[in-house]
Amino acid sequence: MRRGTSIALIALGIASLLSGSSQAAVTVLGNGLARTCFLAAEFGGGSAEEGVKACSDALEQMALPVRDRAATLVNRGILYSRLDEPQMAIADYDKGIAMEPSLGEAYVDRGASLIVLSRYDEAVQDIDKGIAMGSNRLQIAYYDRGIAQEALGNVRAAYEDYKKATEIDPEFTLASSELARFRVVRRHSDGT
């Protein structure tokens, strides 16, 4: 399979990942619109449009603590990703990170949106930061970084990331499918 075709298929995989509920939402405690926004981002209940509205209403109508406001922006970003609006998603991730730079999930989620936009170097940097911060869904982070690494031509790094994702979550079929495409060839000590 040609590299361009492979990257296109990977982009479809990322798009399907973003359309599901596998991005890492940031928890908002209590009741109200911000909590509704979190539940829509985390569990995908209802339509993404309804979730975006709940998030927007929470941001406009509620006096949220800084962390909850940042989390609500990140959660709305996830919902924008599901609506195939990566630029809108990135704008919300940027605002959330500016308010609360310690949200590791925000970096991983922004990295996923950057992959959709073919901004692979930036995606790797963001995902690296999210991993270093201890993102709650490391298997997603490693999978996403593997996609970006493969798109950059860093095949060995991609393999290692897909492998790490399956070590963290052996049931993670997207990573297992990517890993299955690889063939490991051992080299002799003389380089052949």
Where are the regions a protein language model picked out?
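Register position in tetratricopeptide repeats
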Residues: R82, V116, A151, E178-H188
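Residue-level recognition of tetratricopeptide repeat
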Residues: R69, L103, R137-L138, F172
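Conserved structural position within tetratricopeptide repeats
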Residues: D57-E60, L64, K95-A98, K129-M133, ...
